[in-house]
Amino acid sequence: MPKDIEIKVLIKRTNIDVKLAEKLVNVANEVRSNYMSGMLSKSVSTRETLACAELVVDGFSILDAVDFVISNKYINNNYNSEYSDVKKLIVGF
């Protein structure tokens, strides 16, 4: 989904602030890019960015919301290095 459309979806469905929606989509797109290049084994869906946005609207920080919804997908014996990689991406935003 194009970035601007995903941002609009987040805003419409959750009433999240525009700047926060942009940050969430930027993080998601960075993870998606790493998935497409083979650096990660899983991608991020719009449903997951919506879940992050809902948590942010409910009072979570972006960092905590993305960590809870996205980073935790990579916690597994096989993906611990991916978890670390995703955490680094998140902290960069």
Placement of each model-derived feature along the sequence:
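C-terminal regulatory/interaction module of P-loop NTP-utilizing enzymes
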Residues: 1-93
